[in-house]
């Protein structure tokens, strides 16, 4: 159970498993608990009851850094609020989660060259368009900001990558690139949880789709066995049987 900012239960009695080597998409109309679920999984929101397991370990009460160190990657829904410090350099943003580890830090001192070296490698690998690795993150386009976040998260080789609205507001080229990177993670045997309000994105990227309605997962379907019409009906509160009966009536 997870409450929203008003203290109202936004996630209720939810049970979901994401396996290695698959992308699970969370589909639902905005406001049905998806954002609160992602925040709870990533450590940005407390849960009232229940548990969160990552590779068999209970991470329910762990702070965000320890979840990250335990193998959780997170592409946040709001890249400006939770993904980047816009006034800081791109290199600093890329190293922000591992700044206390070698080679970025040694004996309590930061190694500026190591930050730049890391940023240059990821800029090249993830095609981040920037005039300099030290330019302020806020000076980049939305697509390049998102690529930088994805580069930072994937470079840590997380066991589970949570991607919340990863392509919102981006152009077609950036969208295709990000989809490819998510699928690459799946193909490497990683678990990927994708939350999106765009049904075509869910259908194009996910292997299984969990539909949320009023804070609960009402159904989980194989992507190959469903379609946009059925998902839309489930998102509006219909059962699978009701949705398929309505589809038959429409034929």
Question: Language-model segments: what does each one mean?
Answer:
Residues 1-251:
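Glycine-rich phosphate-binding loops of nucleotide-dependent enzymes
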């Amino acid at each position: 159970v997870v409450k929203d900012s008003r203290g109202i239960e936004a996630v209720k009695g939810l049970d979901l498993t994401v396996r290695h080597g698959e992308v699970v998409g969370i589909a639902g109309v905005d406001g049905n608990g998806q954002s609160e679920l992602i925040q709870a999984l990533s450590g940005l929101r407390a849960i009232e009851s229940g548990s969160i397991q990552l590779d068999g370990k209970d991470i329910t009460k762990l702070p965000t850094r320890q979840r990250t160190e335990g193998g959780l990657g997170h592409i946040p829904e709001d890249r400006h609020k939770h993904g980047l410090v816009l006034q800081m350099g791109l290199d600093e943003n890329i190293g922000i989660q591992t700044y206390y580890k070698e080679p970025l830090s040694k004996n309590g001192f930061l190694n500026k060259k190591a930050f730049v070296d890391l940023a240059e490698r990821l800029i090249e690998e993830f095609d981040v368009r920037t005039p300099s690795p030290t330019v302020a993150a806020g000076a980049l386009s939305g697509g390049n900001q998102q690529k930088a976040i994805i580069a930072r998260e994937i470079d840590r080789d997380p066991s589970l990558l949570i991607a919340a609205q990863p392509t919102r507001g981006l152009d077609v080229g950036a969208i295709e690139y990000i989809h490819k990177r998510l699928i690459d993670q799946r193909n490497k045997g990683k678990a990927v949880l994708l939350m999106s309000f765009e049904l075509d994105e869910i259908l194009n990227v996910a292997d299984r789709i969990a539909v949320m309605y009023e804070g609960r997962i009402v159904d989980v379907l194989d992507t190959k066995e469903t379609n946009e019409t059925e998902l839309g009906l489930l998102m509006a509160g219909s059962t699978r049987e009701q949705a398929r009966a309505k589809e038959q009536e429409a034929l």
